[in-house]
């Protein structure tokens, strides 16, 4: 109870600062849930989506969401889209199966890094990166290697605050079907929570951990949250809607 009350106070203090935020990857499952939670909590005075296409929303809550459509192959031409945001969330990502090896590297490393560079130049103070459990630039696995590489490259940009989230298998009802994901989610979803939490995590828990972490003051410039820390922080709901 004391923890949720403290979190509610932190949220209220954060709201009073009238900060602005951008989200990269709002069309994906994590980005979509993140946007929903941000709007429900009313944490920012301005919310901007940066993506390759404009998204359509029917709900009234989304009417004031700003959208910047960019060409990720020519991001330097869209530097203005990254200007004036206090906080940034990057949920960009694809798979090797969908985009091929070169396409995967281009999206998950090159697009992310260039976006971070433009955000830093545009005045962003706190950059949040959705990475992956096991990310390691020295890994022999391309997926984990690329995730580790971009983590390190973004850290070199020296944001005032840089938060990296490394969730395990994301449990969600993904709109876009990816080969094998349904079976994996079904497997982890059927396991006892105490065991599954080491290897998987619901998307909504990741999102809540991101936002709960954001409103808490930190002295460290860089912070890394592994799957267990994401579980623990994401379970503190405070005044969040169920």
Curated annotation (Swiss-Prot):
Alphabetized GO MF terms: NAD binding; oxidoreductase activity, acting on the aldehyde or oxo group of donors, NAD or NADP as acceptor
Which is one Pfam family of this protein? NAD_binding_10
| Residue intervals passing through the bilayer | none
> Would you tell me the Gene Ontology cellular component terms?
cytoplasm; nuclear envelope
Q: Could you say which residues bind NADPH here?
A: 27-30, 52-53, 92-93, 143, 147, 170, 178
The organism's taxonomic lineage, starting at the top: Eukaryota, Metazoa, Chordata, Craniata, Vertebrata
This chain is encoded by the gene named: HTATIP2
* Keywords, alphabetical: Acetylation, Cytoplasm, Disulfide bond, NADP, Translation regulation, Tumor suppressor
| Active site (record annotation) | 143, 147
Q: Does the record bear Glycosyltransferase in its keywords?
A: no
| Localisation | Cytoplasm
Q: Which GO terms describe its biological process?
A: alpha-amino acid biosynthetic process; angiogenesis; apoptotic process; cell differentiation; import into nucleus
- The segments labelled Required for interaction with elongation factor EEF1A1 in the record are 2-25
Against InterPro entries, the record matches this protein to: NAD(P)-bd_dom, NAD(P)-bd_dom_sf, Semialdehyde_DH_NAD-bd
Tell me where on the tree of life, at the top rank, the source sits. Answer: Eukaryota
Question: Oligomeric state and partners?
Answer: Monomer. Forms homodimers during oxidative stress. Interacts (via N-terminus) with elongation factor EEF1A1 (via middle-region); the interaction is direct and competes with EEF1A1 binding to guanyl-nucleotide exchange factor EEF1B2, thereby inhibiting GDP for GTP exchange and reactivation of EEF1A1. Interacts with nuclear transport receptors XPO4, IPO5/RANBP5, IPO7, IPO9 and KPNB1 as well as GCN1L1/GCN1 and LRPPRC probably through their HEAT repeats. Binds NCOA5/CIA.
Name by which UniProt lists this protein: Protein HTATIP2
Function, as annotated = Represses translation by preventing reactivation of elongation factor eEF1A. May also inhibit nuclear import by competing with nuclear import substrates for binding to a subset of nuclear transport receptors. Has additionally been proposed to act as a redox sensor involved in cellular oxidative stress surveillance.
Residues that the record marks as modified (N-acetylalanine) are 2
């Amino acid at each position: 109870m004391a923890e949720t009350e403290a979190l509610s106070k932190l949220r209220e203090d954060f709201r009073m600062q009238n900060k602005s935020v951008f989200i990269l990857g709002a069309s994906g499952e994590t980005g979509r849930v993140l946007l929903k939670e941000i709007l429900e909590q009313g944490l920012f005075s301005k919310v901007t989506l940066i993506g390759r296409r404009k998204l359509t929303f029917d709900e009234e809550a989304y009417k004031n969401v700003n959208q910047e459509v960019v060409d990720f192959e020519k991001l330097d031409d869209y530097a203005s889209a990254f200007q004036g945001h206090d906080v940034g969330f990057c949920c960009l990502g694809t798979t090797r199966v969908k985009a091929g090896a070169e396409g995967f590297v281009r999206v998950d490393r090159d697009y992310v890094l260039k976006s971070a560079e433009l955000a830093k130049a545009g005045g962003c103070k706190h950059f949040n990166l959705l990475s992956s459990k096991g990310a390691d630039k020295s890994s022999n696995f391309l997926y984990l290697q690329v995730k580790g590489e971009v983590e390190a490259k973004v850290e070199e940009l020296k944001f005032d605050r840089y938060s990296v989230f490394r969730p395990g298998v994301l449990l969600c009802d993904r709109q876009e079907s990816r080969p094998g994901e349904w079976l994996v989610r079904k497997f982890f979803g059927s396991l006892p929570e105490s065991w599954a939490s080491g290897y998987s995590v619901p998307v909504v828990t990741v999102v809540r951990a991101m936002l709960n972490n954001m409103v808490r003051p930190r002295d460290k410039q860089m912070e890394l949250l592994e799957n267990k820390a994401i579980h623990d922080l994401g379970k503190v709901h405070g005044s969040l809607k169920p």
